[in-house]
Structures are given as C-alpha cells and as structure tokens.
Amino acid sequence: MPKRKSPENTEGKDGTKLTKQEPTRRSARLSAKPVPPKPESKPRKTSAKKEPGTKISRGAKGKKEEKQEAGEEGTAPSANGDTKVEEAQRTESIEKEGE
C-alpha cells in the first residue's frame, strides 16, 4: 500500500491529486474533560484447595465415566452401532442390580 504523501511534496506524476491531511488529535474540549474513574471490580472468590488424593463426585460427568468403563468391559455396542441380544440382556441386568 502506498504511503501518504505530504502536501509539500506534490511534485511528480501524482502532483495533481490532493492528499488527505493528517487526522487531528483530540479536540481541546474532549481533552479538557477528566477521564471517568473505573469502577472497582469485586474480588473473585477463591476455592479451597483440596488434597490431590480425594475424589469428588461430579454428577453427570461421573455417570459418563461409568458408561465408558462399562464399555471397556465388553458391554458396549459393537463397532457398527448394532447391539447383540446378549449384550442388551447384560446391560438390563446390570441396571436392575444398581437400583
């Protein structure tokens, strides 16, 4: 992109074109106003640090993990998405035992 040419340097092949003036800085009226103070932000609450060995039940996330673990045991649907009758019966019996 070509640089702006100063109005003093209007000689040459682009001498007939007028160049834009540099934009002026803030007007005196705006610079006279004081900047409004920023509102203080509330300090964030810090959570209590837990020991690394303790486990916390996470609700829905925990259920997903249980399903993944069950899938590793061989009760998950087969690769193409179809379930076998034996696998369906196993999952039903596991769900009944859990209740």
From Swiss-Prot:
Superkingdom, natural source: Eukaryota
* GO CC entries: chromatin; nucleoplasm; nucleus
| Listed GO biological process terms | chromatin organization; positive regulation of transcription by RNA polymerase II; regulation of insulin secretion involved in cellular response to glucose stimulus; regulation of transcription by RNA polymerase II; transcription by RNA polymerase II
Name any one Pfam family assigned in the record: HMG14_17
Decide whether keyword NAD is in the record.
no
Acyltransferase keyword on record = no
**Location within or outside the cell:** Nucleus
User: Which Gene Ontology MF annotations are present?
Assistant: chromatin binding; nucleosomal DNA binding
Q: Where does the record place Basic and acidic residues bias?
A: 1-25, 39-53, 83-99
Main location per the UniProt record? nucleus
Q: Using the UniProt annotation, give all residue ranges assigned to the region (Disordered).
A: 1-99
Q: What happens when the gene is disrupted?
A: Mice are viable and fertile. Mice have a mild diabetic phenotype and lower plasma glucagon levels. The overall shape of the islets, the location of the alpha cells in the mantle of the pancreatic islets or proliferation of pancreatic alpha cells are not affected.
Where are the Phosphoserine residues found in this chain? 6, 78, 93
InterPro entries attached here?
Answer: HMGN_fam
User: What is the tissue localization of expression for this protein?
Assistant: Expressed in the brain, eye, prostate, thyroid, kidney, testis, glial cells and insulin-producing cells of the Langerhans pancreatic islets. In the brain, expressed in the lateral olfactory tract, anterior commissure, corpus callosum, internal capsule, fornix, stria medullans, optic tract, axon bundles, Purkinje cell layer and granular layer of the cerebellum. In retina, expressed in the nuclei of cells in the inner nuclear layer including amacrine, bipolar and horizontal neurons and in the nuclei of ganglion neurons. Detected at low levels in the liver.
Tell me where in this chain the PTM Phosphothreonine is found.
10
Provide the alphabetized UniProt keywords: Chromatin regulator, DNA-binding, Nucleus, Phosphoprotein
- Cysteine pairs forming cystine bridges in this chain are none
Q: Please state which protein family the record places this protein in.
A: Belongs to the HMGN family.
Instruction: Tell me the function of this protein.
Output: Binds to nucleosomes, regulating chromatin structure and consequently, chromatin-dependent processes such as transcription, DNA replication and DNA repair. Affects both insulin and glucagon levels and modulates the expression of pancreatic genes involved in insulin secretion. Regulates the expression of the glucose transporter SLC2A2 by binding specifically to its promoter region and recruiting PDX1 and additional transcription factors.
Q: What interactions and quaternary structure are annotated?
A: Interacts with the ligand binding domain of the thyroid receptor (TR) (in vitro). Requires the presence of thyroid hormone for its interaction. Interacts with transcriptional regulator SEHBP. Interacts with nucleosomes.
**Designated name of the protein:** High mobility group nucleosome-binding domain-containing protein 3
**What is the protein's species of origin?**
Mus musculus
Gene behind the chain: Hmgn3
